[in-house]
Amino acid sequence: MSAKERGDQNAVVDALRSIQPAVFIPASVVIVAMIVVSVVYSSVAENAFVRLNSAITGGVGWWYILVATGFVVFALYCGISRIGTIRLGRDDELPEFSFWAWLAMLFSAGMGIGLVFYGVAEPLSHYLRPPRSRGVPALTDAAANQAMALTVFHWGLHAWAIYVVVGLGMAYMTYRRGRPLSVRWLLEPVVGRGRVEGALGHAVDVIAIVGTLFGVATSLGFGITQIASGLEYLGWIRVDNWWMVGMIAAITATATASVVSGVSKGLKWLSNINMALAAALALFVLLLGPTLFLLQSWVQNLGGYVQSLPQFMLRTAPFSHDGWLGDWTIFYWGWWISWAPFVGMFIARISRGRTIREFIGAVLLVPTVIASLWFTIFGDSALLRQRNNGDMLVNGAVDTNTSLFRLLDGLPIGAITSVLAVLVIVFFFVTSSDSGSLVIDILSAGGELDPPKLTRVYWAVLEGVAAAVLLLIGGAGSLTALRTAAIATALPFSIVMVVACYAMTKAFHFDLAATPRLLHVTVPDVVAAGNRRRHDISATLSGLIAVRDVDSGTYIVHPDTGALTVTAPPDPLDDHVFESDRHVTRRNTTSSR
């Protein structure tokens, strides 16, 4: 046997050893089965999933609205309170990636492709058909202002707060408490290690894998449709099935090469290029379009978003039956929740060494501001053009696939900006595909941070094959059915996320209670504070001392020396640490007091 053959054999053995059969096999079977059903019975599957989605929207849409707002409150609480001082790693650990590289990767994976796909189409849609419950006439200036506020609302704090819940919890459990990087471990502080390692944990990871792969595959399919429609609109190609297959194959091959090279190489490199191209495209439109109008609109859109947020965030419109809320807000909240395992886990993977406050500030606030700027540049440009020229609609409707290219075609050097737009779409899809493949691979390997390359290739290729088969054989109906199925996974996963918020709160409070802080005090101060039964003094040495917040009933003050005897709070994780090369072990932060 040659060295190459032995190497290939070893790679296969390593891949088989790395997978977790209780997760890998059921997830693969469910994915393949649903693809087959969606292709063979495309119309039946589409109707069935549409009815399922209607039932979810009508029956539990209020739940999506409630929990999405709750996640915003949870994220802000963690960022503003003392919880924000906790580091996602050892107390002295530095971030793994630079701030800008980190921001580029999380933004590209999070919703970059959606910004390109809906940057023009969504504001136009709200302008053309605003929600009846708001009472704003269509095609008016008031409708334009409301359209931008609604668009930023759908892509702002609520979307990223959903990602924060999963990403923050997984980063904390992995880099601070030594758990595998897997969704199931979010529940350990509540359900215990035994259930997490059992059937419940397997089911959570399978749901996460299925939702992630279907979400990425359907996005790839719809994205290819947008690229093809745009190129055909510009008169550059005549689209047929071979063009579709070729584009999917090229994107899948690039994504596979990137995911094999790892996060610190391919993914980081592509994300940086992607953000540079996206920034160049936005700058082109800003400078070549109505610049002053767009800058004024951006400030107004931010103000409109802040002003309308209290009205939008808990609005269920029970007296309105136009279906707008289900088609837009509830759809988006379900879509973001279904993507939360993928995006949240990927953000966790690249956030080692950040503090919780830094994590939330960057993940929650920065993308919201960037999204508002992006939608202002493209959305307000389209609204102004439609208001003045009336040429952004096709037969009185918004064409999502060609609306971006229609806008660019009306600007100077439209051909150049259109080429740039195609490149941005392609790179956004590549970064979404390779990060999605990496996340799925980590989940199927039981949380191993660096799974074998062979399994990474398996998931990346499966995403591309799923998109190609669904698009070419089943058509748009199959893609819609599978996207609806992905959104349906949001209902059970939203319950997992609510439990995770409670579990993480318990773990964070223990961490604060068990981690020492340093203050400079004198002996008289300590004795006096001890006599007054203050909460924050735990030693009697003059100089720098270790202190922590404790409840008044958990310590005893010696009447003569002021020394404290403190009872340690119970650890919701039972202080179990995994000693493994694959996972990050938490440094023991407790000390004698």
UniProtKB/Swiss-Prot annotation:
Protein family according to the UniProt entry: Belongs to the BCCT transporter (TC 2.A.15) family.
Gene Ontology terms, MF aspect: transmembrane transporter activity
NCBIfam families: bcct (TIGR00842)
The organism's place on the tree of life at top rank: Bacteria
UniProt keyword annotations, A-Z: Cell membrane, Membrane, Transmembrane, Transmembrane helix, Transport
Annotated coiled-coil segments of the chain: none
Organism of derivation: Mycobacterium tuberculosis (strain ATCC 25618 / H37Rv)
Topology in the lipid bilayer: Multi-pass membrane protein
Name the UniProt record assigns to this protein: Uncharacterized transporter Rv0917
Subcellular location, principal: membrane
PANTHER family reported in the protein's UniProt record: HIGH-AFFINITY CHOLINE TRANSPORT PROTEIN, HIGH-AFFINITY CHOLINE TRANSPORT PROTEIN-RELATED
Gene Ontology cellular-component terms listed: extracellular region; plasma membrane
Listed Pfam families: BCCT
Lineage, broadest ranks: Bacteria, Bacillati, Actinomycetota, Actinomycetes, Mycobacteriales
Residues passing through the membrane, by range: 21-41, 60-80, 97-117, 148-168, 204-224, 243-263, 275-295, 328-348, 359-379, 410-430, 457-477, 485-505
Subcellular location: Cell membrane
